Swiss-Prot record:
It catalyses: an acyl phosphate + sn-glycerol 3-phosphate = a 1-acyl-sn-glycero-3-phosphate + phosphate. It is a multi-pass membrane protein. It is found in: Cell membrane. Keywords: Cell membrane, Lipid biosynthesis, Lipid metabolism, Membrane, Phospholipid biosynthesis, Phospholipid metabolism, Transferase, Transmembrane, Transmembrane helix. Belongs to the PlsY family. This is Glycerol-3-phosphate acyltransferase 2. Catalyzes the transfer of an acyl group from acyl-phosphate (acyl-PO(4)) to glycerol-3-phosphate (G3P) to form lysophosphatidic acid (LPA). This enzyme utilizes acyl-phosphate as fatty acyl donor, but not acyl-CoA or acyl-ACP. One of its GO terms (cellular component) is plasma membrane. InterPro entries: G3P_acylTferase_PlsY (IPR003811). Pathway: Lipid metabolism; phospholipid metabolism. The gene is plsY2. Its EC number is 2.3.1.275. GO terms for biological process: phospholipid biosynthetic process.
Length: 193
């Protein structure tokens, strides 16, 4: 029963379309109709600016964190990372936004933060360093996933390794168009770093 309750809560948390809410409430803009059309932090940064993008990033991280922290607080008999994955699914396929969501990078990070804060710090550091060097958000997301997968070896936790593998695969798959644009030289670079 715990899996059903916390799984549903996690999916619904993940389904909260932060970018859509910030865009409509703060700017009277449906972010899905601009830029990449993606309901994520990167599109929000590009279309609405740093303040809105930062709010969406933090909100998306919080969704993943809450999904993993709540079962721990209630001492639920569940595999917490499996529950966290449902928040990631909710972010990608949100019931509150016609199942058209984001790429789940921030929500995945938040999920890890709720269980493995040190791994989260390593992920953020990897992301920012790669972003500083490459100026590509998509490439930074992919490299962060792959580095995180390598680092999970040190945790000697098979479940964590499987979940991080799944998250890395999801991130790579969700960025397949970005990968094509990087190869073609048409992927937008950031200019603020």
């Amino acid at each position: 029963m715990d899996y059903v309750i916390f799984g549903l809560v996690a999916y619904l948390l993940g389904s909260i379309p932060s970018a859509l809410i910030v865009g409509k409430v703060g700017y009277n803009i449906d972010i899905r109709e601009h830029g990449s059309g993606n309901l994520g932090a990167t599109n929000t940064f590009r279309i609405l600016g740093t303040k809105a993008g930062s709010i969406v990033t933090l909100a998306d991280i919080l969704k993943g964190t809450l999904a993993t922290v709540l079962p721990q607080l209630f001492d639920a008999n569940v595999y917490v990372l499996a529950i966290g994955l449902l928040a990631v699914v909710g972010h990608m396929y949100p019931i509150f936004a016609k199942f058209r969501g984001g790429k789940a990078v921030a929500t995945s990070g938040g999920m890890i933060l709720g269980m493995y804060p040190l791994l989260f710090v390593i992920m953020v550091t990897t992301f920012l360093l790669t972003l500083y060097i490459s100026k590509y958000v998509s490439l930074s997301s992919i490299i962060t996933g792959l580095v995180s997968l390598l680092i999970t070896i040190f945790y000697q936790d098979l479940g964590l390794s499987i979940v991080v593998f799944l998250l890395s695969a999801i991130v790579c798959y969700r960025h397949r168009e970005n990968i094509k644009r990087i190869k073609n030289g048409t992927e937008p670079k950031i200019s603020w770093m």
